């Protein structure tokens, strides 16, 4: 029935049949058979439908678990090299979520354990990026924690349960979603025991944190304050079961290769001793591939903690060729990102191959891996990004080796200019 109230001159004042607003209170009133609907109600209906569609898509994608090969293939789009680590991660993550998908089905006598992961590799080799990409691929909540900020409960610093609180924040405190999430704990090697021998002094940021993390990683019900804040007795807590949360720990473990080499090298004295030259020494990545749980214990992790991380994946050091690939090949490659920024100003950005090689060399010298690439490019392009928005006539910027080495300025090519391009003005 048409909703009309109080006549107006020759016509009747029309009202929305859903919210009751008059035609003067809304921008548009759409007529139907004996009903009217305003533009505000149409927008509200669209929002409701959009939310339901997104939830249905998320639910269907959660049930469809990609195979290990598919997981590895997607990782290839973002992470260069590290094939062995990708394979280990793909299998471990696939088995973990396969276990979760089967948990509601008819149980038998076989109980599948959780396979938490330990990533070992040099700085800038892709540990964090691998974990982030996995979480994005699986559409699950993901958070990163820094092990160096953690302390035992009762001491100044972050409590280990703050990790779960961060995970809850990522999914708007939806406990069910959080219990299916992934937690990446970085710098895990920094909480190694300070010495092999137990000390009478309390190690609240080393072995103490390992002890505190044990139950959380293995599986426990953590009490987390709602909406953050510190705990107090009168407060209600959110109960989060961590049994199904996948924990990935990562660290550079600098010096671990020496522990491995000492174990694997058979020493001797006298005429029968084996003499090794320095050239025969293995690269760090090659040594790390031979890591065993006992090596991690000697490094400073307690045996119980090592036992909670049954899946080990090692990452290799990135060489010059790999760094050049990282600059150009991944979906989110740095050269593509900067080219996009310049494109927004209507300018083409070109990196010559010798420039990319020079950037890779400088990153190797800094020993920061892929992490150092952005800071190098940011420094090189700073003046150009400062000038370009004020120079509408520039159509292209060319970066070569001499620019990276600081010997010359980037080459600016102007619209309607002759083939010989002008050099960039001094800053």
Swiss-Prot record:
Q: Which residues form the ClpX-type ZB domain?
A: 4-57
Q: Which family does it belong to?
A: Belongs to the ClpX chaperone family.
List the gene name.
clpX
Q: Which organism is it from?
A: Pseudomonas fluorescens (strain Pf0-1)
Q: Which GO terms describe its biological process?
A: cell division; proteolysis involved in protein catabolic process
Q: Which GO cellular component terms, listed alphabetically, does the Swiss-Prot or TrEMBL entry include?
A: HslUV protease complex
SMART domains per record:
AAA (SM00382), ClpB_D2-small (SM01086), zf-C4_ClpX (SM00994)
InterPro entries, per this entry? Answer: AAA+_ATPase (IPR003593), ATP-dep_Clp_protease_ClpX (IPR050052), ATPase_AAA_core (IPR003959), Clp_ATPase_C (IPR019489), Clp_protease_ATP-bd_su_ClpX (IPR004487), ClpX_bact (IPR046425), P-loop_NTPase (IPR027417), Znf_CppX_C4 (IPR010603)
Q: Name one Pfam family in it.
A: AAA_2
Q: What is this protein called?
A: ATP-dependent Clp protease ATP-binding subunit ClpX
Q: Which residues of this UniProt protein bind ATP?
A: 122-129
**Top-level taxonomic group:** Bacteria
Q: How does it assemble?
A: Component of the ClpX-ClpP complex. Forms a hexameric ring that, in the presence of ATP, binds to fourteen ClpP subunits assembled into a disk-like structure with a central cavity, resembling the structure of eukaryotic proteasomes.
User: What are the UniProt keywords, alphabetically?
Assistant: ATP-binding, Chaperone, Metal-binding, Nucleotide-binding, Zinc
Q: Which residues bind Zn(2+)?
A: 16, 19, 38, 41
* Reported function: ATP-dependent specificity component of the Clp protease. It directs the protease to specific substrates. Can perform chaperone functions in the absence of ClpP.
* GO MF terms, alphabetically ordered: ATP binding; ATP hydrolysis activity; ATP-dependent protein folding chaperone; protein dimerization activity; unfolded protein binding; zinc ion binding
